[in-house]
């Protein structure tokens, strides 16, 4: 490629990221698009582009202060790049900050800092110094994925991160060179403006009063939570939907304004995290409406000096002024589209507004009426783009929503647009006329007139398919339009507008159409077409790959198309010379080469390009099996799409890697390549050449970018480009006349409408209507009606109509023959019915179509089998469910649940359904019982050993025994009457000693056993009553039979009372199905029918025999009631017979009858009362369970407090270590600061000593100048500035600039003109150096003072945190101690159940003398009735709650199963994707390609063995050499050791002699050195004096020379003498 001399470059890029548009300076807007950053100058309209060469751009940010742009690439371990504007110089690369991708990046406004946030999987917030490319600090937060990141413009130490569920303010704290991030989460209010109830640390309050409910516990302890979950737990009933932040911005007071998805605006203090909901003054009193400022979602905000700009889904830009918690709407501007983002320019005079449809407006803040639309680009994924005609002026693009837009090829400006409001699926531009064809998902083709580029329009619509159009292709000369779809039909249309885009016909291919390619030849007057097809069904299995189907379209077809098609519109294969070719590899894309003698394809399985040559055999017929003659490397990621240049010399390859490769077809080598799109988004979607080959336009997959490429001008590539240009010019000249004619015809065509289309159809006399489509600017798709038929369907109807007319006579003859044949067969069937059985024929003998009958029979059998299988499966599932329910609710029950109902009153008493006690329960009960016995024996023994028994006299023994008997018999302290109903309470603990947890649990086990015994006793009584009722019903039935006989004899017709058992009394009925319950007639086989008839006859015989006179039975009925012996229990039952007066109304009863009725009711009522006898034992269990529950809550709270204490202690240790470490750093830095201040003071004090060689007057003058400092002018903000943030804090750059200004001012002060009188120049120069040194020290002191103050503030915060941690630990310790005391008090304050006499009510005596003036005396039966009603309603409510709970559980179970299946589906998809992307290594390829792989491996092993042997020999030689060298070195070391010992001895002697000589010198040479020093000082003074005199003389000479220079300069000035005219 380097030798080709050709290179591509980006001409322009179009597309916009709607949420990332911002200013980089006052007149330049920038935004990311694909893997480009686009910069647009709003003044000149010029474009510039910055490309991300490593992939698609991810996060994006701009610093207007430094005019730099930062963006991240999308790859593994991404990098953040920082570039300058407009030079695009790389300033920094920030690496190792994320693993997968950066979600957000943001610049600080003044300081050289950048914040980045990476989401999954690390969730890390990192602060960078982008100028030095180093990370300063980072913090991980794995619980939240944030969506917005901003720095505080007034304080770079603060930044804010927000997501849809949370908002966090981060503080950057600095201590010298160490940085730390501290998070301050903000508690968001609910949507109605209230905040959730926060869980407080409720301290247990000590109290002397006994509380039945125990100490007050927080909700988390009641829920049983311990740990971090308890800190954030809020009960479900107290939870409220909080606001959802969507965007935030800072104001000038360092507060935050937050816009929410529900239309609320919040004001948050960054220091205190206090949240205020802003509301308008004039809103209604409704609290919810007051908290909602805008209808719909607030998507973006921007703060200005005049107020807050807010925009969102409503498409209106609002300006609010805020005062306190109230806002006022000042102004608004309607964009008529949902607004996605807004951004101010650095001067805050212009606001950029980006809408969801891709429009970019520039809003003038001072003059809103001057707002104009800067851009109008695609808002969705691009479908395709192509050049109009020659391709040197305009190109046309379409997105998937049917939005058509025209662009200028020269500069990329948007010319016009047209919204079709359809789902576009394909697009192509005609090379011979200025129009485009767009295919839709409904199978329609829309023809767009672009002659007037400023106003494109729809001129015609044609429906060809019932499925979406997938392919559209024009031949190179614009004569034919070819379309393809999934139904395997290729339609050929006349592409000339003068013929109204006439449909010429269609062909059907053998499979799915992959690509279409054509080649026109002016010599042969025909067009070669090739379709790449993927066969389906059997053909695919036979061929195993793709096929090439080629056919020819002669130009003569345009004038007489009917000669080439049949009556149904299908082309004849012989007329178009259709032929198919098989290729050796499956292809994804293919194009025809020059003269259609070669085919180029891109493999579907590999990233290779293949060249096929079409040959002919000896007989002259073409070879249908093609083998690749040349294979070259394609793109990096496949598969790819191929596109030929118009002059057929180049081929462009575009794949998923996003790179455009241009190859020379002569040698298949790459001429040029350029990265246009990112492989992360899917690479390139479409590519097109201009007619002269000078431009290429590409669209990306899912990145919304439209890229136009051009060739770089160079001498080496001019010849190739010239050939393409010449071909384009020649083709344009040949098509110019036709183009002019067709454009005129296109201009004459009216605008297409649905009404005009329908009228046109009616004029042609057709009986089908057209589709009604509303092509407006709204986002609505057309509704396809049933009458909107396709072209092929109309052709079929016309052909059928012609065939019907042509063969009408033949059809009539056939119909007449069929009628005669039917009559003959019917006569034969009637004759067959009259024949004897032996001569009759079967019915099927008269069936003429046995095959159809057999088919129908088989279909019916299949359907019956399917239905039978479904019914069997359904029955099987129901049987399984029945068995499960029966096992759980019936078989496992030792005592089945049932009831007994009174005959007349409706009273119903239920027994206790009981399961068998498990061995574990019995073992547990036995263990507790043995424990009780052991404790009783132990207590008895201890009492005998320890206690002294008092002596009891004989007179007192009887009293003691009586008291013991009373205590044993009394059940008051036991708390129930369970021992009267089968329960043994002798083994229970006393209620007054239940303190420990184990005792309470053992008591519950014993009480459960007592309840079990009570239930068993009750069930026995219940069974007795049930048997009595059965006997009573049997007796009544016998009586009824006798009464029935008497009534028959007396001819009476009265209804008798026939008592029966209800379903609750006989629950086993639910397990069987009675024949009466089956509503469908039972199917019986012939054998079963015969058996049923026999049984019916037997029953009838029995009934007739029973009707005969039976004297014995009648005698028994008359004398003894139908029995031979009257049993005793029957007599007892007869004591309370059923009253006969129940048939009368209650008003007719006598007093005696009422008395009898009450006695009759008593029995059932007693049974119902016995049911409540065990409730007292259950009350005791509930009390114990309640105490255990409270104790569990206390233990949970204690465990949580212990967890918090442990956590706080660890944090306290950490804070203590941090304080200790930073305190030492601060002390060390303070020491260095004090030293620097001391040095600075020493400079001040030593000034006069340094200039002691001059007079005191001169020293004073110099000292004043020494203290003088120049004034540095500062740039102040203008009073009329619209910037809301004013003067921001100084940055490091500003400080450096101020130092530079100071030094520049010092240079002016150091000039010789400022030398005081009498001071010599050398002294002045020395003074200037001293003053500069003093200033440098002062600046260092200032810097260190600021750093020290910052470090001290940091240390104070850490000390404050450490103290707060200590205080928290003390508070929690105190709360824990109080809670333990409360626990002990609660364990000792027992709840005891006493048994009171029935009918007594205990009242609290609040006064000394109780007053009963307002009291009412009620009978206990009233209260009992009320209680029974309440209890019944409570049971109903509990039943409904249980049913609701079970239903919710079922929903949750289904949701979990759904999620499980979804996850399994995702796992399977991932496995499938991994299998499809399985990488085949080079070794596998060698193994597969090598025929004798074992021989190859043996040869390699032999070579390796020889190599190893050679290396071993060489290694042995090297070892010997190294051993020899080592031996020599050891000998040399020994010699050196001996020499060093000798030198040590000499050194000791030299040291002794040196010390002796030094001592002599110190004694003798002091006086000589003093005299010598004085003499040297004197000579220095003399020399200095001479130098001063010389400097004065030279200064005088310089002064004289300067005066002479000034005099000579004045002579050279021109003399301007006023002249008179």
From Swiss-Prot:
It is found in: Cytoplasm, Cytoskeleton, Cilium axoneme. One of its GO terms (biological process) is epithelial cilium movement involved in extracellular fluid movement. WD repeats lie at residues 97-138, 141-180, 293-330, 334-373, 377-417, 464-503, 634-673, 679-721. Keywords: Cell projection, Coiled coil, Cytoplasm, Cytoskeleton, Repeat, WD repeat. InterPro entries: WD40/YVTN_repeat-like_dom_sf, WD40_repeat_dom_sf, WD40_rpt. It comes from the Eukaryota. Signal peptide: none annotated. One of its GO terms (cellular component) is extracellular region. SMART domains: WD40. Disruption phenotype: Morpholino knockdown of the protein results in embryos with impaired function of motile cilia of the larval epidermis and majority of embryos develop edema around the heart. Residues 792-812, 850-870, 1026-1046, 1098-1118, 1150-1177, 1362-1389, 1451-1514, 1591-1611 form a coiled coil. Gene3D superfamilies: YVTN repeat-like/Quinoprotein amine dehydrogenase (2.130.10.10). Belongs to the CFAP43 family. Involved in the regulation of the beating frequency of motile cilia in multiciliated cells of the larval epidermis. This is Cilia- and flagella-associated protein 43. The gene is cfap43.
């Amino acid at each position: 490629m380097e030798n080709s001399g050709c290179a591509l470059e980006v001409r322009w890029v179009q597309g916009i990221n709607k949420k990332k548009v911002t200013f980089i300076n006052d007149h330049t807007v920038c935004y990311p698009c694909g893997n480009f950053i686009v910069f647009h100058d709003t003044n000149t309209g010029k474009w510039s582009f910055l490309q991300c060469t490593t992939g698609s751009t991810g996060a994006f940010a701009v610093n207007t202060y430094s005019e730099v742009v930062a963006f991240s690439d999308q790859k593994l371990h991404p990098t953040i790049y920082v570039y300058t504007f407009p030079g695009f110089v790389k300033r920094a690369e920030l690496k190792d900050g994320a693993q997968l991708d950066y979600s957000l990046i943001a610049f600080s406004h003044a300081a050289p800092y950048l914040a980045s946030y990476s989401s999954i999987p690390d969730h890390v917030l990192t602060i960078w110094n982008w100028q030095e490319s180093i990370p300063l600090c980072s913090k991980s937060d794995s619980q939240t994925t944030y969506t917005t990141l901003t720095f505080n413009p007034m304080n770079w130490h603060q930044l804010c991160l927000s997501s849809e569920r949370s908002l966090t303010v981060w503080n950057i704290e600095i201590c010298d060179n160490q940085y730390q991030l501290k998070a301050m989460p903000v508690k968001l209010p609910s949507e109605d403006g209230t905040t959730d109830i926060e869980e407080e640390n409720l301290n247990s309050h000590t109290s002397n009063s006994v509380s039945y409910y125990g100490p007050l516990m927080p909700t988390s302890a009641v829920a049983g939570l311990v740990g971090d979950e308890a800190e954030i737990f809020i009960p479900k009933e107290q939870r409220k939907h909080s606001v959802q932040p969507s965007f935030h911005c800072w104001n000038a007071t360092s507060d935050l304004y937050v816009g929410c998805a529900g239309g609320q605006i919040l004001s948050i203090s960054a220091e205190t995290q206090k949240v205020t909901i802003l509301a308008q003054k004039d809103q209604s009193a409704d609290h919810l409406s007051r908290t909602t400022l805008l209808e719909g979602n607030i998507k973006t905000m921007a703060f200005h000096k005049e107020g807050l700009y807010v925009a969102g889904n409503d498409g209106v830009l609002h300006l609010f002024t805020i005062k306190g918690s109230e806002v006022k709407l000042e102004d608004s501007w309607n964009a008529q589209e949902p607004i996605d983002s807004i951004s101010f320019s650095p001067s805050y005079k212009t606001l950029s507004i980006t809408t969801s449809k891709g429009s970019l407006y520039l809003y003038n803040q001072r003059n809103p009426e001057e707002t104009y639309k800067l851009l109008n680009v695609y808002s969705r994924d691009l479908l395709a783009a192509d050049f109009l005609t020659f391709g040197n002026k305009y190109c046309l693009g379409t997105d998937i929503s049917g939005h058509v837009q025209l662009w200028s090829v020269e500069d990329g400006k948007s010319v016009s647009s047209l919204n079709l409001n359809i789902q576009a699926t394909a697009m192509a531009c005609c090379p011979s006329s200025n129009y485009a064809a767009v295919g839709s998902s409904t199978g329609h083709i829309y023809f767009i007139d672009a002659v007037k580029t400023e106003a494109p329009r729809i001129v015609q619509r044609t429906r060809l398919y019932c499925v979406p159009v997938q392919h559209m292709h024009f031949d190179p000369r614009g004569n034919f339009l070819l379309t393809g779809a999934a139904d395997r039909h290729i339609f050929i249309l006349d592409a000339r507008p003068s013929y109204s885009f006439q449909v010429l016909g269609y062909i059907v291919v053998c499979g799915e159409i992959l690509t279409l390619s054509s080649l026109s030849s002016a010599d042969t007057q025909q067009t070669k077409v090739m379709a790449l097809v993927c066969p389906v069904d059997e053909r695919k299995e036979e061929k195993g790959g793709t096929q090439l189907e080629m056919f020819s379209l002669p130009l003569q077809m345009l004038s007489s198309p009917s000669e080439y098609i049949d009556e149904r519109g299908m082309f004849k294969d012989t007329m178009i010379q259709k032929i198919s070719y098989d290729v050796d590899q499956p292809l994804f894309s293919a194009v025809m080469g020059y003269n259609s003698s070669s085919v180029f394809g891109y493999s579907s399985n590999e990233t290779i390009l293949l060249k096929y040559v079409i040959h002919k055999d000896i007989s002259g017929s073409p070879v249908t099996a093609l083998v690749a003659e040349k294979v070259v490397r394609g793109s990096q990621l496949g598969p790819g799409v191929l596109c030929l240049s118009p002059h057929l010399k180049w081929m462009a390859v575009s794949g998923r890697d996003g790179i455009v490769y241009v190859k020379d077809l002569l040698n298949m080598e790459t001429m040029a390549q350029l990265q246009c799109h990112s492989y992360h988004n899917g690479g390139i979607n479409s590519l097109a050449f201009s007619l002269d080959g000078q431009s290429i336009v590409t669209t990306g997959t899912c990145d919304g970018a439209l890229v136009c490429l051009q060739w770089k001008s160079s001498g080496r590539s001019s010849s190739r480009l010239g050939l393409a240009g010449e071909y384009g010019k020649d083709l344009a000249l040949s098509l110019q006349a036709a183009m002019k004619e067709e454009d005129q015809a296109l201009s004459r065509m009216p605008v297409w409408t649905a009404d005009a289309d329908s009228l046109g159809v009616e004029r042609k006399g057709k009986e089908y209507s057209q589709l009604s489509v509303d092509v407006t600017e709204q986002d609505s798709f057309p509704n396809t009606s049933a009458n909107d038929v396709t072209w092929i369907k109309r052709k079929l109807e016309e052909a059928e109509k012609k065939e019907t007319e042509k063969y009408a006579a033949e059809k009539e003859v056939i119909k007449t023959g069929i009628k005669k044949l039917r009559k003959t067969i019917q006569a034969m069937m009637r004759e067959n019915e009259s024949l004897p059985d032996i001569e009759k024929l079967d019915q099927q003998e008269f069936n003429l179509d046995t095959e159809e009958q057999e088919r129908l029979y088989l279909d019916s059998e299949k359907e019956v089998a399917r239905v039978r299988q479904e019914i069997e499966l359904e029955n099987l599932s129901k049987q399984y469910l029945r068995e499960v329910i029966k096992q759980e609710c019936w078989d496992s029950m030792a005592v089945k649940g049932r009831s007994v109902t009174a005959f007349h009153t409706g009273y119903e008493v239920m027994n206790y359904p009981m399961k068998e006690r498990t061995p574990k329960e019995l073992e547990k009960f036995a263990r507790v019982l043995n424990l009780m016995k052991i404790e009783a024996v132990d207590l008895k023994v201890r009492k005998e050993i320890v206690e002294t028994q008092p002596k009891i006299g004989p007179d007192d023994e009887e009293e003691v025994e009586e008291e013991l008997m009373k205590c044993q018999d009394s059940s008051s302290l036991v708390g129930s009457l369970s021992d009267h109903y089968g329960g043994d309470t002798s083994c229970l603990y006393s209620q007054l000693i239940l303190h420990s947890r184990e005792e309470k649990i053992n008591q519950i086990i014993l009480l459960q056993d007592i309840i079990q015994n009570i239930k068993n006793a009750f069930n026995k009584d219940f069974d007795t009553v049930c048997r009595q009722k059965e006997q009573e019903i049997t007796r009544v039935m016998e009586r009824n039979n006798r009464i029935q006989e008497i009534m028959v004899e007396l001819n009476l017709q009265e209804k008798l009372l026939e008592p029966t058992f209800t379903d609750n009394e006989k629950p086993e009925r639910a397990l069987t199905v009675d024949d009466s319950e089956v509503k469908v007639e039972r199917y019986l086989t012939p054998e079963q029918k015969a058996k049923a008839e026999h049984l019916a006859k037997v029953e009838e015989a029995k009934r007739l025999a029973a009707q005969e006179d039976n004297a014995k039975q009648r005698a028994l009925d008359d004398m003894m009631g139908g029995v031979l012996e009257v049993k005793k229990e029957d007599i007892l039952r007869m004591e309370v017979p059923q009253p006969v007066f129940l048939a009368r109304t209650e008003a007719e009863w006598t007093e005696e009858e009422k008395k009898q009725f009450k006695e009759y009711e008593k029995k059932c009522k007693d049974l119902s009362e016995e049911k409540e006898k065990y409730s007292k034992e259950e009350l005791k269990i509930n009390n114990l369970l309640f105490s255990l529950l409270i104790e569990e809550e206390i233990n949970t709270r204690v465990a949580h407090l212990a967890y918090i204490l442990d956590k706080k202690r660890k944090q306290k240790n950490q804070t203590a270590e941090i304080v200790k470490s930073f305190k030492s750093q601060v002390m060390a830095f303070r020491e260095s600061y004090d030293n620097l201040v001391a040095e600075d003071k020493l400079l001040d004090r030593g000034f006069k000593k340094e200039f002691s060689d001059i007079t005191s007057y001169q020293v004073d003058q110099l000292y004043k100048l020494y203290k003088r400092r120049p004034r540095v002018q500062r740039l102040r903000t203008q009073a009329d500035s619209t910037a809301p943030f004013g003067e921001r804090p100084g940055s490091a750059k500003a400080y450096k600039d101020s130092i530079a200004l100071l030094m520049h001012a010092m240079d002016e002060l150091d000039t010789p003109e400022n030398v005081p009188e009498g001071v010599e120049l050398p002294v002045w120069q020395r003074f200037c150096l001293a003053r500069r040194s003093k200033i440098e020290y002062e600046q260092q002191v200032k810097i260190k003072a600021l750093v020290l103050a910052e470090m001290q503030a940091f240390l104070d915060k850490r000390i404050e945190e450490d103290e707060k941690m200590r205080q928290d630990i003390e508070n929690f310790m105190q709360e824990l101690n109080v809670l333990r005391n409360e626990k002990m008090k609660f364990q000792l304050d027992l709840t005891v159940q006493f048994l009171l006499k029935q009918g007594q009510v205990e009242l609290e005596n609040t006064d000394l003398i109780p007053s009963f003036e307002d009291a009412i005396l009620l009978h206990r039966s009233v209260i009992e009735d009320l209680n029974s009603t309440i209890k019944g309603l409570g049971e109903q409510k509990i039943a409904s709650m249980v049913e609701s709970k079970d239903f919710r559980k079922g929903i949750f179970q289904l949701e979990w199963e759904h999620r499980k299946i979804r996850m399994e589906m995702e796992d399977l998809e991932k496995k499938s994707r991994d299998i499809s992307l399985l990488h085949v290594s080079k070794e596998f390829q060698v193994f597969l390609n090598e025929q004798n792989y074992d021989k190859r491996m043996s040869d390699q092993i032999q070579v390796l063995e020889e190599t190893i042997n050679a290396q071993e020999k060489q290694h042995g030689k090297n070892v010997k050499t190294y051993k020899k060298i080592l031996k020599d070195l050891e000998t040399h070391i020994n010699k050196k050791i001996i020499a060093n010992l000798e030198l040590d001895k000499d050194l000791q002697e030299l040291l002794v002699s040196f010390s002796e000589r030094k001592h002599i010198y110190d004694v003798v040479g002091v006086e000589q050195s003093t005299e010598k020093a004085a003499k040297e000082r004197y000579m220095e003074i003399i020399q200095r004096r001479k130098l001063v005199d010389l400097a004065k003389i030279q200064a005088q000479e310089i002064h004289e020379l300067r005066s002479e220079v000034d005099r000579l300069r004045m002579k050279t000035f021109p003399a301007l003498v006023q002249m008179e005219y």
